[in-house]
């Protein structure tokens, strides 16, 4: 959890925002997935958001659903994902690692056991996409017991009550949603979210990272100009993996070429 705090402090000092890529663990196979993650970090990723393949990903659009299917086709299991996480942490000791997942995967292990395993492999945060704030107590309590930050989604239409709850229960960062709907680069991020950012700050929430529909450097810049601490890009990155599925070297080069200008856009 402390990795987020020290990262945001360092970025603030350097007058930068965070650029955060999302990929599904094990897409398109374990070996290439580890190379993809190394490439994202080398190209300038400040933190990682990683998905564990799940059979019914409700919040995800077709691009990320396909990533999940590719990981399943490669035979990737949650146990292997945790082995990958341990390897990533060993190689990259300081980068914050977040998981973005669904409640069933947490229940399968038992809630406490799941967060204990996260702590063991060096995961810093977990966002459970299908658990609303008001039902989050058993998840967030287990998370905090194991020094894992519980992450909450702040939708664009959040009312005052919800903003207060998110500020009170969330740690690490706040996932600020650009718009309603499912993930996807086709649907560009909507209006600047200045009013939400201001409210979250007022209630002392964890720093907001804007996600959903972030696929170009100008959107990263706009998110940071609106007061977000950074931006998360998922579908645009997963699309690059899809486009170069049969050319692993080209894939890594294309990912690097995408991430570098996205990171550059975080510098004021």
Swiss-Prot record:
Keywords: Amino-acid biosynthesis, Aromatic amino acid biosynthesis, Lyase, Tryptophan biosynthesis. It is an enzyme of class 4 (lyase). It holds the Pfam family Trp_syntA. GO terms for cellular component: cytosol. It comes from the Bacteria. PROSITE patterns: TRP_SYNTHASE_ALPHA. It catalyses: (1S,2R)-1-C-(indol-3-yl)glycerol 3-phosphate + L-serine = D-glyceraldehyde 3-phosphate + L-tryptophan + H2O. The keyword Amino-acid biosynthesis applies. One of its GO terms (molecular function) is tryptophan synthase activity. InterPro entries: Aldolase_TIM, RibuloseP-bd_barrel, Trp_synthase_alpha_AS, Trp_synthase_suA. NCBIfam families: trpA (TIGR00262). PANTHER family: TRYPTOPHAN SYNTHASE ALPHA CHAIN, CHLOROPLASTIC, TRYPTOPHAN SYNTHASE, ALPHA CHAIN. Tetramer of two alpha and two beta chains. Belongs to the TrpA family. This is Tryptophan synthase alpha chain. It comes from Escherichia coli O157:H7. The gene is trpA.
